Curated annotation (Swiss-Prot):
The modification N-acetylmethionine is found at M1. Pfam families: Serpin (PF00079). InterPro entries: Serpin_CS, Serpin_dom, Serpin_fam, Serpin_sf, Serpin_sf_1, Serpin_sf_2. This is Leukocyte elastase inhibitor. The gene is serpinb1. PROSITE patterns: SERPIN. GO terms for cellular component: cytoplasm; extracellular space. It comes from the Eukaryota. Belongs to the serpin family. Ov-serpin subfamily. Regulates the activity of the neutrophil proteases. It is found in: Cytoplasm. Gene3D superfamilies: Alpha-1-antitrypsin, domain 1, Antithrombin, subunit I, domain 2, Serpins superfamily.
Length: 377
């Protein structure tokens, strides 16, 4: 399963860099695990060149027993006996009721991804179909994503809508005291600032300083330490935008492992803004630009493992996400453990009053559930 987590992390940073081409300074938030899972369900039904392109783009070529690994990963993430946090990754296919999907494909998707096929009438009851899909996503994300499909995103030629939703709500292992939250300035760049509600606590937490890129890394565990938020904060804004440019160029699976492996429990003065991010992406152009060209092309998509007809292709990949960070913890949605005993003696400052990157990690599987950039209130 480690290979699968690595593949999903590689894809996470590839996609981040692609999205960054058209949005290099704004807030950003998405769920790589949710997207990888959704696209793996499609991959199950692809053949030929379409499958090759997907495998390469998603780094699936390095993973043995891909779909059974996803089955194990999803079971680990969706553990039902957890009472300290809510985490739910859900998948579903919605198919045009007159269209024939191969029974083999449907049974594989059900077995490996716990996803069934909802049949809807795109041809004569388009609006009802759209509402039904939105209702399912809203239920899976506890109402945080009420409308994954806006008007006009599906039409009467739609045959298949692939929906994937992930929801997370967790409390910090060490909560912030709301009485210590105050209005403070947040520096957007060298010239502009805005006021934020800044939380504060002093706590012993895993911390690391990376001198090569002048960055501080802090781990904020959630209750039970099964999940953590990891925040990567440059010392200063040293470029003409967010101060994150050098760090973002360096991002890779290897670097994240290197930076987070040597974290030491350290007394840290933490200033972290309360924030809420909501994002919506249409990812067809980014994924095609990363190499998945044929999947979205009606003339060349090979989804013959999904349907006997040769005119099926994917028209769009829509991803919506939501995260809220406050004194109690984090609530996040997207449609789509122990601490070492060595200890640093000195106290460190971790003052997130300027743009930073953050990720929410499932510690046992080292899977990045969510990845984001906070650059503006």
């Amino acid at each position: 399963m480690e290979n699968l987590s690595s593949a999903c992390t590689h894809f996470c940073f590839d996609l981040f860099k692609k999205i960054n081409e058209n949005n290099s300074t704004g807030n950003l938030f998405f769920s790589p695990i949710s997207l990888s899972t959704a696209l793996a369900m499609v991959f199950l039904g692809t053949k030929g060149k379409t499958a090759e392109q997907m495998s390469k783009t998603l780094h699936f070529d390095a993973v043995k027993d891909l779909h059974s690994n996803f089955q194990t990963l999803n079971a680990e993430i969706n553990k039902k006996d957890v009472s300290t946090y809510a985490l739910n990754l859900a998948n579903r296919l919605f198919g045009e009721k007159t269209f024939n999907f191969l029974p083999n494909f449907l049974s594989s998707v059900k077995k490996q991804y716990s996803a069934d096929l909802g049949t809807v009438d795109f041809i004569s009851a388009l609006e009802d179909a759209r509402k039904e899909i939105n209702k399912w996503v809203s239920e899976q994300t506890k109402g945080k994503i009420p409308e994954v499909l806006s008007t006009g995103t599906v039409d009467r030629s739609t045959k298949l809508v692939l929906v994937n939703a992930i929801y997370f709500k967790g409390d910090w292992a060490k909560k912030f005291n709301a009485e210590h939250t105050t209005d403070m300035p947040f520096q957007l760049n060298k010239k502009e600032q805005k006021t934020v509600k800044m939380m504060y606590q002093k706590e012993k937490l895993p911390f690391n300083y990376i001198p090569d890129i002048n960055c501080r890394i802090l781990e904020l565990p959630y209750v039970d330490y099964e999940l953590s938020m990891i925040i990567i904060l440059p010392d200063n804004i040293n470029d003409d935008t967010t101060g994150l440019q050098q760090l973002e160029k360096e991002l890779s699976l290897e670097k994240i492992h290197e930076w987070t492996e040597n974290m030491m429990p350290t007394d840290v003065h933490i200033h972290l803004p309360k924030f809420k991010l909501e994002d919506s992406y249409k990812l067809k152009s980014q994924l095609a630009g990363m190499g998945m060209v044929d999947l979205f092309n009606s003339g060349s998509a090979d989804l013959s493992g999904m349907s006997g007809s040769n005119n099926l292709f994917l028209s769009e990949v829509i991803h919506k996400s939501f995260v809220e960070v406050n004194e109690e913890g984090t609530e996040a949605a997207a449609a789509s453990a122990g601490i070492a005993m060595m200890c640093m003696m000195r106290e460190e400052e971790f003052n997130a009053d300027h743009p930073f990157l953050f990720l929410i990690r499932h510690n046992a599987t080292k899977s990045i559930l969510f990845f984001g950039r906070y650059s503006s209130p």
